[in-house]
Amino acid sequence: MAQRYDDLPHYGGMDGVGIPSTMYGDPHAARSMQPVHHLNHGPPLHSHQYPHTAHTNAMAPSMGSSVNDALKRDKDAIYGHPLFPLLALIFEKCELATCTPREPGVAGGDVCSSESFNEDIAVFAKQIRAEKPLFSSNPELDNLMIQAIQVLRFHLLELEKVHELCDNFCHRYISCLKGKMPIDLVIDDREGGSKSDSEDITRSANLTDQPSWNRDHDDTASTRSGGTPGPSSGGHTSHSGDNSSEQGDGLDNSVASPSTGDDDDPDKDKKRHKKRGIFPKVATNIMRAWLFQHLTHPYPSEEQKKQLAQDTGLTILQVNNWFINARRRIVQPMIDQSNRAVSQGTPYNPDGQPMGGFVMDGQQHMGIRAPGPMSGMGMNMGMEGQWHYM
């Protein structure tokens, strides 16, 4: 359609069928249809406006005039068909559906919807029947007009489906963004995990530094006493079963109040408290106590995690993350330190295997010393071990 129907003065556009042309505005008031040069199925409708006139002029005058007359008759038949205004209307709706912003709150926003076209068909049918019949005397032309209207109608429906899918996707995406996502909880967990990691690093470093300090202390005491237990030991000797139970109590006490031996320095004490995570001290002590009581298998089950979460007031995820970090930051350094102590000392003796020590609240160092030649190595636990307070 090289030129709009309402640009032709002898047809009058939509005014010729009784539908006011201002119902949807005049989108062609400030522009005109650009010529289409790439169509090669025939010469243009208005040959006097385009450079293709050279081809028509090259033909014989009688042949050129006959072609132009045939095209003019076909064009006049299409433009004068009773259904042409309806075809032009749905074409405008398809064009508006792709270029007009769709605002649900704006008046006239549904002008290009398929429902509005149904109303336009009803209005058009009433008006056209009162003036002239819907079809012409050419059945082929009637069929062409009906098929063209149906194709544009299907196109309008497809455009409406695309808009509906786009709106649905946008609505679901916005609802997902506005949903209650536990972002604050995730951030808290991450911060808690990082701070607890730093706390565990500090404490594990303190645990690894203690054996060397205790060995020096032990060597001094053994030199002074000639390898015999000091007077502060009180002669409390126990068997292996009692020794194990006392060791467990000592571990629990050390967990309740961990210390580095440098608490006299207020700056280090402040730094240690600054590095403490958001976990309460009571909760950390409970989990550390459980860890040291299960050093042979420091992997709590799901039921034990739930119980620890109830006891500490933390979430199961926080408890799980803490034990993951603890196995890497606390248990592994203790194992490495024990292996180094074995490799640096005498050959391995099951009666005197070195083991790291712990410090009590009152700055009194608690060590487990086995009598005999192994006493010079410091923190040793034997079958005949005894408590020794430095």
UniProtKB/Swiss-Prot annotation:
Gene3D superfamilies: Homeodomain-like. Acts as a transcriptional regulator of PAX6. Acts as a transcriptional activator of PF4 in complex with PBX1 or PBX2. Required for hematopoiesis, megakaryocyte lineage development and vascular patterning. May function as a cofactor for HOXA7 and HOXA9 in the induction of myeloid leukemias. Keywords: Activator, Developmental protein, DNA-binding, Homeobox, Nucleus, Transcription. Transmembrane segments: none annotated. Residues 203-213 have a biased composition (Polar residues). Its main location: nucleus. Belongs to the TALE/MEIS homeobox family. Interacts with the N-terminal region of PBX1 to form a heterodimer which binds DNA including a cAMP-responsive sequence in CYP17. Also forms heterodimers with PBX2. Forms heterotrimers with PBX1 or PBX2 and a number of HOX proteins including HOXA9, HOXD4 and HOXD9 where it acts as a non-DNA-binding partner. Also forms heterotrimers with PBX1 and HOX proteins including HOXD9 and HOXD10 where PBX1 is the non-DNA-binding partner. Heterodimer with DLX3. Heterodimer with HOXB13. Residues 335-390 are annotated as: Required for transcriptional activation. Residues 190-279 are annotated as: Disordered. The keyword Mitochondrion does not apply. It is linked to Restless legs syndrome 7: A neurologic sleep/wake disorder characterized by uncomfortable and unpleasant sensations in the legs that appear at rest, usually at night, inducing an irresistible desire to move the legs. The disorder results in nocturnal insomnia and chronic sleep deprivation. The majority of patients also have periodic limb movements in sleep, which are characterized by involuntary, highly stereotypical, regularly occurring limb movements that occur during sleep. PANTHER family: HOMEOBOX PROTEIN TRANSCRIPTION FACTORS (PTHR11850). This is Homeobox protein Meis1. The lineage of its organism: Eukaryota, Metazoa, Chordata, Craniata, Vertebrata. CDD domains: homeodomain. GO terms for molecular function: chromatin binding; DNA binding; DNA-binding transcription activator activity, RNA polymerase II-specific; DNA-binding transcription factor activity, RNA polymerase II-specific; RNA polymerase II cis-regulatory region sequence-specific DNA binding. Residues 299-329 are annotated as: Interaction with DNA. Residues 108-192 form the MEIS N-terminal domain.
